[in-house]
């Protein structure tokens, strides 16, 4: 059996001139079924059979490895895309959280101002001071700005 000393992708398995066995390319060797391979191996020496089977196994393993590499790269790209998407979602939620904290702080301040005002009203008539008047005005203005619904009414 003679082969090319420099193997290439389309290496042909050549038989000695006296034999009738057909020439098999790498693609043919890999793609044929076991039954077809066994038919081609009939009449070959044990050494040639072993060499062809080893070559077929090597080529198939090479194909499996290439397939695995492609799958791994594809999965890596998909995971990277998901990571970027989730990172953007985390950033968006952090912005929403920050905004809601600011809103909560503003509502807490209004609530505390209303409580203070309610305590001063509950104590009875007081002489208006500049601080108390400012507090009431602030409360009234902030209530008008923040609420488009009906403000507090006396008639219930």
Swiss-Prot record:
Work out whether the entry's keyword set contains Repressor.
yes
One family from Pfam that matches here is bZIP_Maf
Subcellular localization(s) per the UniProt record: Nucleus
PROSITE patterns reported for this sequence: BZIP
GO cellular component terms, semicolon-separated: nucleus
Where is the region Leucine-zipper? 79-93
Quaternary structure per UniProt? Homodimer or heterodimer.
Kindly provide the name given to this protein in its UniProt entry: Transcription factor MafK
Per the UniProt record, the source organism is Gallus gallus (Chicken)
Give the lineage. Eukaryota, Metazoa, Chordata, Craniata, Vertebrata
Name of the gene: MAFK
């Amino acid at each position: 059996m003679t082969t090319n000393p420099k193997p290439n992708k389309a290496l042909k398995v050549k038989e000695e001139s006296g034999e009738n066995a057909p020439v098999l390319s790498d693609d043919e060797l890999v793609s044929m079924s076991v039954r077809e391979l066994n038919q081609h191996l009939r009449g070959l020496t044990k050494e040639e059979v072993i060499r062809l089977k080893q070559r077929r196994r090597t080529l198939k393993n090479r194909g499996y490895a290439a397939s695995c590499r492609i799958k791994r790269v594809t999965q890596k790209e998909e995971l990277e895309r998901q990571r970027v998407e989730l990172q953007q979602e985390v950033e968006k939620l952090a912005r929403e959280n920050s905004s809601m904290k600011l809103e909560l702080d503003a509502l807490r301040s209004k609530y505390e101002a209303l409580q203070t005002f309610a305590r001063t009203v509950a104590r009875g008539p007081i002489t208006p001071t500049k601080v108390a008047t400012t507090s009431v005005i602030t409360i009234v203005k902030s209530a008008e700005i923040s609420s488009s619904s009906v403000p507090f009414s006396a008639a219930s």
